[in-house]
Amino acid sequence: MELGRISAIFRYPVKSMAGELLDVARLSWHGIEGDRRLAFRRLTDKSGFPWLTASKLPQLLLYKPFGLDSNTAERLPTHVRTPDGKEYELRSDELREEVSSRYGSDVELMNLKHGIFDEACISVLSLGTVHGIERESGRDVDRRRFRPNVAIETRSAEPFEEDRWVGRTLMFGEGNSGAALRVTMRDERCVMVNFDPDTAERDSEVMKTVVRMNGNYAGVYGTVVRAGELRVGQVVTLGA
């Protein structure tokens, strides 16, 4: 059954920093290549989730990785532009000190080749869900608030139709040889959706609306069952 087409592809090389909008991406066994391979670890945190995220430091969303390192297999960024417009090498002490100072505690940059994910290696969101939340909340809701890897413009445009995809397969492109993922669970949202991706300002009405409309779920997570290329405009089919 044809669901619609890919509207946008995002990757987030550094966890909780600004994402990159892509026209084409390689979907590997560990998600989109280069996605969330880097993160800042809070050195004083002894929990099982020590990563610094925008829930702890909203301004992290305003740091913009850029450049491409041709010496890395997944072509990770080389530099980061800070909210103040300063530019540092990604792996430099200057950037580490800048982030540590803004957070108020020491951090260090970590590189995990299989990615640093909250639940699963790829997330998918329909534009119908975004538009439904917009209508209900009375806000202009940027799809980037939800930090999806793949945004789909579905034929029905029904909000939260992704919920019905759980346990089924999304296939990308024509035929049966393209990339595919198994939808494993709904995406339960956190305070991240409240932050404007351009200003880091908080608007709690966004998350309240998601809770009211769909029990705090918006979008889905999946695991890769067939690697391949993703491309904006590509047909998306729902399989068994």
Show where each model-derived region lies.
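Metal-cofactor-dependent catalytic cores
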Residues: 1-240
